[in-house]
Amino acid sequence: MKETNNSEPCLKISFKKGLEGIELPLMKTEKNGYTIFFLLDTGANKNYIRQDFLNLPELNNDTITLDDMEEFYGIDNVCHQAQTCNFRFDLGEYGYMERFQVISDGAALMFPTTSGKPFHVAGILGTPFLTKYNAQMNFRTSELLISLPEGQREPEYNLDSLMADYQV
């Protein structure tokens, strides 16, 4: 991961680790007021999202378009075909737009729990997301520090220029 410039505005997000049956850190996000969980995986070379998740009416995903099929090699070294899409989600008050590889098998991101009810994860935020936003993961404090998205950064105000607006 790249180092985050200390003068660059950042967002600090808490994540859960060691959740029952899930080894990767888990981050809670939102879209249209709907809670979404993503795994954070520094070893994933792509971002992944479940296809059945994209069809949830609560998310109002009618603007999401799936791109043409692409080929990729999985961990089993077998060539697979999948679609990609852009998906926007919210972290705090900021919106992040990311490109995802669509996973057609939703069972790949469901985890069993002791209650018997599976825990559903929308997808995986991998190296593309973590690198793009200069992510720094602190496993001791369970915090993720990421850069704010372009175009959504707080404007830098210069006191002299603000005062010039008020001169008579």
Say what each PLM segment does:
Residues 1-168:
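Pepsin/retropepsin-fold aspartyl endopeptidases
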